[in-house]
Amino acid sequence: MGKNDERFEFYFDCFVFFYDFCRRIKQRYDSMENTGKIFGISLGPGDPELITLKALKALNAVEVIFCPGTKSGEGRMKSRALDILRQLEVDETKIRLFQVPMSRDRQEALCAYDRVCGEVLELVRSGKSVGITAEGDACFYSSAHYMYGQLA
């Protein structure tokens, strides 16, 4: 094999490597293009008039909104977050209320979060944008806070 043949083989191998590298990046980019986004949306201290403009824009922009609630002693679902969303006139067809069991045994709540995370990931993988609401700040002791680790 001559020197020119060796160079050709070297450059050809480099070209194949670079082509394959670019193809893998494009595949990854294409798969990300169809991926939705997840937003933790803070609803503020309880008064709907105190929600930030950015949170309100996020509520209107997302396609699905997960909203935590609890069951009352009579077995009815209650959700302060849902009450706020209704006062803000958010499209109720986008809202998915989920139950967070209030118990000293946190395992029940963690199981509920696992179920919701599965739904969220399925929606995001199908290209939907999803919001998870929280009374107060979504980063502190909220349902969104507990789910961030699983969704990351």
Model regions: which residues?
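Class I S-adenosyl-L-methionine
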Residues: 32-48, 53-56, 60-152
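Compositionally biased, intrinsically disordered low-complexity segments enriched
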Residues: 13, 29-31
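Acidic/polar hotspots within intrinsically disordered regions
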Residues: 4-5, 19, 29
